[in-house]
Structures are given as structure tokens and as C-alpha cells.
Amino acid sequence: IHYAVIDQLTDQPVGSLALMRIDAKNGVVEVGHVHFSPLLSRTAMATEAHSLLMHYVFDTLGYRRYEWKCNSLNEPSRRAALRLGFQYEGRFRQALVIKGHNRDTDWFSIIDSEWPQIHRAMRQWLAADNFSADGQQLRTLESFR
């Protein structure tokens, strides 16, 4: 299920992300196909988009586990997962063949017992008083956890 991220100031799409590998019986879902334009990447709006989707998964759907998987060589994706509160679970070596080459996949997750603390930290980080007049964060997201 793909979701568009819409900039509320311009009413224009600036990115998308998807819920994949949906396992309702076990309450497990993966976030993936995250595509953010330069207007969205590395912004408070990007963090808010992830926070809103996590809130939907945990608090509306009642799921137990939220997964993030990425190419082990994709350092920006790995950093984003960790920054958002995902726990690194391990590397699945040679998990895929992409364009004729082996690809290792790193797995990350947030589970329902971790979600309240992560959600609280995201709300505190996203609060207007955590940003200067020019939009710079005063404290990191990690510092709220």
C-alpha cells in the first residue's frame, strides 16, 4: 500500500512510502519504497511522515512489529532507520540477486513495546520549540529517547 507525502504549504506531493509484506495475522508489516524528493529528504516533514505511518501501524492497526530492510551498502538508509528508533537485527547475506550481483540485506525493526518511547521522542522532537526561527533543530531526535 503506497502513501503519498503531501507538503501542506504547497499541496504538492514531495515523496512516497509504502507498507509492504503485510502480515495481519501476526501483526507484522514492513515500510519500504521510501522515495523522498530533495524538498523532503532530511527534513522535519520527512520525520513526521515516518511518525504518522508508524502511528497508523501501531495505534490504529494494532500491529506488533514494524520492519525496515535495506541494502547493507546503503548507509543513508541504515542511518535513517537507526535515527528513527529502529533496532538493528542483523544482516542477511546474499539475500538477493540484483542486476546479477549478490546483495546483503540489513534488517531493522521497532516492536510495539518500544513504540511509546519512540512516539514520545518524535512528538518532542517535532515540537515547534525544538526548532530555531530559521528551522534548525535545537536537539537531535536521539537525544529525546
Predicted regions and their residues:
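A short helix-loop-beta-strand connector motif used in the catalytic cores of GNAT acetyltransferases and
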Residues: 1-4
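Acyl-donor (CoA/ACP) binding surface of acyl/acetyltransferases
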Residues: 9-145
